[in-house]
Amino acid sequence: MSTDVNRRAVLLGLLSAAAMWDESPIGAQDAQTAPDPTLYIPRAHVVEERAFLHDFMEEYAFVSLITTTPALRITHIPTILDRARGRLGTIRGHISAQNPQKAALDGTHPAVIVFRGPHSYISPSWYAVRESVVPTWNFGVVHASGRPRLITDRDKAYDLLATLIRTNERRAGSTSYDFAAQPREYVDRMMQGISPFEMEIDALEGKFKLGQERSEGDRSGVLEHLKAGGYKERSLYDLTAALYQNRPK
């Protein structure tokens, strides 16, 4: 986000009480058909509400695409989310046409896309009780699993780029760049250098380790120090404060 105020407004919007603390699973159908979990999540740190996870994925859309066929490959890319396609949504993005990872993007091989949110070291000196305590690291993360496939239709590939650019131009506060006004011949040449793909999501896992299980005094101390920190710490403060605010009493 362009400012701390805007970023916190987004996070507060994400963490509505109804969305954050829905203890029901995504759905019985999802539980029966989802792949094995990729992430260890203690119950206190689980978030299962789909709208919240989607909001988080859109806010932190620069991801790690992880595949293991024919070898372990990890690529870091921006993405866009289509919430309406598939049971849990569809993620779209592109990698370099020269990237050997594209061999895994044929719709048959499993992949995990990792969305990382704010994170920070947490010092025991911030707690109200400072005996028998150790440091930790607080964070929010979402894993999306599926079987990505290359987009071979040129019009669909163009639409992916147009949507990705339009979304990020809006987030950057820019109004002067018009991708549609670029010469199509030039765009077609540039598109030869990318391998666009889409992945219908088979499973979503949300882990938000933000000290939910600690005492009120400990949580207050953590918030105080995060708020006084740098940009990274203040980003985590925004997410943590919103979570604490909407936590059931």
Write out the residue ranges for each language-model feature.
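N-terminal secretory signal peptides and thylakoid transit peptides that target proteins
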Residues: S2-A17
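A generic structural signal for short beta-strands and their flanking turns/coil linkers
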Residues: A61, T75, R87-I91, G107-A111, ...
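Catalytic micro-motifs at enzyme active sites that drive phosphoryl/nucleotidyl and oxygen chemistry
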Residues: F52, I66-T69, P100-A103, R130-V133, ...
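C-terminal segment of classical bacterial N-terminal signal peptides
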Residues: M20-P25
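A short mixed-secondary-structure module that forms the rim of ligand-binding clefts
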Residues: I80-S123
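An N-terminal domain-cap segment
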Residues: T33-L88
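Charged, gly/pro-rich active-site loop segments
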Residues: D36-I41, P118-K249
